[in-house]
Amino acid sequence: MITILAGGTGSVKLVRGLASHETDVNVISNVGDNYWLYGLYICPDIDTIIYGLADLLDYEKGWGIKKDTFGFLRQMEILGEENWFRIGDRDAATHLIRTNMLKNGKNLSDITQWMCEKFAIETKVFPITDNILETRITSNGESLHLQEFWVKHRGKGPIEGIEYIGADKARPLPSAVNAIQDAELVIIAPGNPLTSIGPMINIKGISKELSKYKR
């Protein structure tokens, strides 16, 4: 069994490649860049991995669904809302269903598993935790959510600090821990070490489990 710790855009190629050649692959996804917008709960890294495994990903952009349309976003702009976060119409359906399931008491891990089943994905995909974990960047004295810093402000401005809000209280998903413990090989996929991998290894217990594979 191979277990991959993955971000989104930088990790999805490796995930797809291994999943196409190996039958027993587990993917543990970062959740530090999850974001509430328009009342929808958006999980960019999880969705990128799922879309990639389902061959739905817009490979040119590295995110979102290929050939998606943006009528929803245009209408939000007409109604006076900001449109800096590019949500496609089909992508919006994913966020809407996830948000409704969360409001009905489902955990993020349950929803992720359900979505994998809907897309006929055999590879197991787990969020690193079902708890709140948020990556925030301090720039010019202001604390910004990672999406606001990278997407809204395009990464402009000095980085004065980085915080993983909730990492000290978040519990690693038991299935994710088991996937690390039972793996013959654990791979940390390509990704930003601070914003994709950092949130995961700052959760209590994850670094300890990974250190067992140190050669």
Task: Give, region by region, the residue ranges found by the protein language model.
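Extreme N-terminal starter segment of soluble prokaryotic enzymes
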Residues: M1-T3
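Short glycine/serine/threonine-rich phosphate/pyrophosphate-binding segments
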Residues: G10-V15, T195-P199
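Short, conserved loop/helix-junction motifs that constitute active-site signature segments
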Residues: A19-T23, S207-K214
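Short internal beta-strands
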Residues: N26-G32, K214-R215
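Electropositive, gly/pro-rich neighborhoods at or near active sites that engage anionic ligands
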Residues: N30-Y164
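Short gly/ser/thr-rich secondary-structure transition/capping motifs
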Residues: G166-R171
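An anion/phosphate-binding loop that grips the pyrophosphate of nucleotide cofactors and donors
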Residues: A183
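Charged helix-capping and loop-helix junction motifs
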Residues: M200-S207
